[in-house]
Each structure stands twice: as C-alpha cells, then as structure tokens.
Amino acid sequence: MQVSVETTQGLERRLTISVPAEQIENTVKEALKSEAKRARIPGFRPGKVPVSVINKRYGSAIRQDIMGEVMQRNFVEAIIAEKLNPAGAPTLTPGSTEGENFEFVATFEIYPEVELKGLESITVEQPTAEVTEADVDAMIETLRNQHATFEVADRAAAEGDKAKINFVGSIDGEEFEGGKADDFELQLGSGRMIPGFESGVEGHKAGEEFNIEVTFPEDYHAENLKGKVATFAITLNEVQAANLPEVNDEFATLFGITEGGIDALRAEISKNMSRELEQALKANVKEQVLNGLVEQNDIELPTALINGEVEVLRKQAMQRFGDQAANMPELPADLFTEQAARRVKVGLLLGEVIKTNELKAEDERVQGLIASMASAYEDPSEVVAYYNGNEELMQNMRNVALEEQAVEALLKTATLTEKAVNFEEFMNKATGRA
C-alpha cells in the first residue's frame, strides 16, 4: 500500500491510496468460489455451479462490495500509519482499476491541534447567596396562590383576582390579528399579558367598559407589533376574588407531608430551594468559565462535527413539538449552526483541559451527582439503583463529573471575585423569569 497526504484547505486532508490490483483480484476470486458453493441455481447441482456462471450473474456486485471493503480497510491502515485523527467519516472515491494498482482517494477533516491559551485571563464573578426564612415565606405564598379557590366578588378588580374580559385591540384605529377575545380569563398580576395590560384592568368593576393604552415590547414575538402603541377596548364581565388556604398542618398534607406539619413543610421547602440554588450558582460560574475559555481560544472547527451537532439540536427541537412535529417542515440548519459551533468548540477545549490535567471521573463525585439528582424523586434509592445498573446513564454522569472537574481546574488559574446576590433576583434571572 502506498499513501500520499495532501492538505487541501484548513482541516481537510486528501489521502491518495494505492493498493496492488492483485490483492483485489485474489479476494474477488475467493469470493466467487465461496458464492459458487452456496448458490442455488436451476440446472446445477448444489455446490457445483461453475465460477464463470457466478461471475456473470453476481461478479459486478461482488467486486463492488470487495472494493468498498478494501478501501475502508486500507483507509484505516493509512490514517494509523500517517497518525491522522479524522473528525468525521471520509468520502471514498475509487479511481482506476486498470494496471498493476487500484488507486482511490479519501477526503476527510481532522481534529484541530488545540493549545490552550489565556487561562489566567479568565475572570469570574462568583455569586453567593443563601435561602432565608423570608425566601421560604415567599415560596409558601406562591404555593398558597397555586392552591387558591375563586368566587365572584362585587368589588373593583385587584392584583391576584381573576377577571373575565372581552377585549379588542387596535393600532392607529385599525384592529390587528390576535388582538381580540371574548370571555377571556386572566389572573391579574400573573405577567401573562404585555406590561400595562393587567394593571389597566385593576380598579374596575364588573360591567364597566374602558380603554387602556399599552406599548408592545421591542422583543415581542410578532414582528408587526414590536414597539407599537396599541389601544384595547375592554369590557369587564366578572371579577373573581382568590380564597387562599390557611398555612397550617392541613395545608402541609397537600404536599405529601404526613408528619411534622408546617414545620416539616418549611424544612422540605428550604432543602429543595437550597438544592436548586446550589445548582444555579454552579451553572452560573460554569457559564462564565466557558465563556472566558471560548473568548481566549480561537480554534478551527471541523465542519463535520458542526453538522453532526446541528442534527442533534434539530432533532431535540423537533421532539419538543411532540405529535405536531410530523406535520411540520424540517427546521433549517442555519437556526442551529451558531449554537452547534459553540458546543463543538467548548467540547474540544474542555477535552484538552481534561487531557492536560490528566483528569478522570471521580467515583465519589459521580455518586454525589446521582444522589443529588435522585433526591428530587419520591424514592431516591430506587433512582440511584437504576442509574448504577445502567451503563449508558452512568457514562453520561461520568461525563458530567469530568466536565465539572475541568471547570474546577480552570477556576484555579482564573481571577475570582465574590458577589453577594439576592436569592429571588438571582433565581428569577437564572430561570429566565427576570
């Protein structure tokens, strides 16, 4: 086998591989003989079909299969010999089969050589927060509102009430699509409508007709409404006041607390909020570290890896549409290209961090991650056992642990400053509610 390597552009390589034609011919002959022994052809006894008949019937297909096998096998041998690391499947193009040698071309991309830079220039503002009794009180109030009952009230609408309304929206005197509804039920203060709409209903009684003027946000999803001033003609049909459950031991049973009453509920809420806070704090620091790593290191990315990641993201996006996905056109690749490229870049850079620091997933950390995740379930021990019995899930958790360890390694050389933050504000921002 003879091999020549050519750099076509960037990470793309072209291998021209030459294999003795005799090697292929001998393999074809053996394959024809083997097929002749197995073939069942009318007019010939089993195992007695002449090779010439087999060649006439199946020779072309057999030769194509063998050429494919020869190309694949010799490609693997060539990249090992040339110490090349393909980033994707090669395109194999057969050349001439005449003469003494069979020549083919393999075109593919290789992984880039990654040399980490600027790790000392990464800056991280490390948020610190804790769950206070006031935060637990606020969560209990949220739970009370979620379990509220409503009854018709003969008074002006206020925040927390439900209002049934008819409304017609217009811009410059013209109604717009989607701006009209009858008997629309809205909980005031929920933030469901654009700013100013819900507060504009407050203070009015059932039977009143009135107008409110609001401005659509600049980032509103409908392009034709962004930043526009609209007038809504509203009829308030009914006001319903909320009846909130009392905070007592009976209230605690709504959340599976059978012993310890409201004190046990508060302890459980505090534990869950603390777990969510810890996860959000770690995610915030991780995002800053990765942003810094990406900014400090500019590397060439294999198109094959980006395309593969695009397909993963596209599939995930389609799955979120559920049954509707079957009736939808395929989402265009350019919707995901930027995110896919970042994922590939982060993966390559973290891989080098792991390699440089000789990191291996720590068993204790892996089990800690599983235990933390399982604690959110009714029977944590069952979840832990399930994970430990599933190698694919365990490998996923090892990868998460390795990523954590890589981020911690980067933090050792980064510049850190602590900043105290408010629990509610931080969590709202972390979950996109800010």
From Swiss-Prot:
EC number: 5.2.1.8
Record-linked Gene3D superfamilies: 3.10.50.40, Trigger factor ribosome-binding domain, Trigger factor, C-terminal domain
Keyword Cell division: yes
A GO BP entry: chaperone-mediated protein folding
Domain of life (superkingdom): Bacteria
Location(s), subcellular: Cytoplasm
One term under GO cellular component: cytoplasm
Classification via SUPFAM superfamilies: FKBP-like (SSF54534), Triger factor/SurA peptide-binding domain-like (SSF109998), Trigger factor ribosome-binding domain (SSF102735)
Sorted UniProt keywords: Cell cycle, Cell division, Chaperone, Cytoplasm, Isomerase, Rotamase
Cell division recorded as keyword: yes
Top-level EC class: isomerase
Family designation: Belongs to the FKBP-type PPIase family. Tig subfamily.
Function: Involved in protein export. Acts as a chaperone by maintaining the newly synthesized protein in an open conformation. Functions as a peptidyl-prolyl cis-trans isomerase.
Protein name: Trigger factor
Species of the source: Shewanella pealeana (strain ATCC 700345 / ANG-SQ1)
